[in-house]
């Protein structure tokens, strides 16, 4: 499966949350099916995401690229360190959590 294409389709057709602060809130509340982090996510944010995702039993995928690349894949003119897939839409992105 092409991860980049899956992310883009999920952003375009599904429901996603972009940004580390909103992502952490969503994970705490259990709002989402999959968390995706950029490889260069700051250590403190990465630690928070991993800790809260264990508590809420949400799988976390580390994207093998920078936050600049992740932002570009999402079609955004800014960096994206973390995104939460709430609804995948037409994407098969949730297959990576298996």
UniProtKB/Swiss-Prot annotation:
A GO cellular component annotation in the UniProt record: cytosolic large ribosomal subunit
Give one GO term, molecular function aspect.
RNA binding
Q: Which GO terms describe its biological process?
A: translation
> Could you tell me which Gene3D superfamilies the record lists for this protein?
3.30.1330.30
Pfam families associated with the record: Ribosomal_L7Ae
Superkingdom, according to UniProt?
A: Archaea
Keywords per UniProt: Ribonucleoprotein, Ribosomal protein
NCBIfam families from the UniProt entry:
PRK01018.1
Family statement drawn from the similarity comment of this UniProt entry? Belongs to the eukaryotic ribosomal protein eL30 family.
For this entry, the protein name equals Large ribosomal subunit protein eL30
What is the protein's species of origin? Methanosphaera stadtmanae (strain ATCC 43021 / DSM 3091 / JCM 11832 / MCB-3)
Its lineage opens with:
Archaea, Methanobacteriati, Methanobacteriota, Methanomada group, Methanobacteria
Instruction: Tell me the name of the encoding gene.
Output: rpl30e
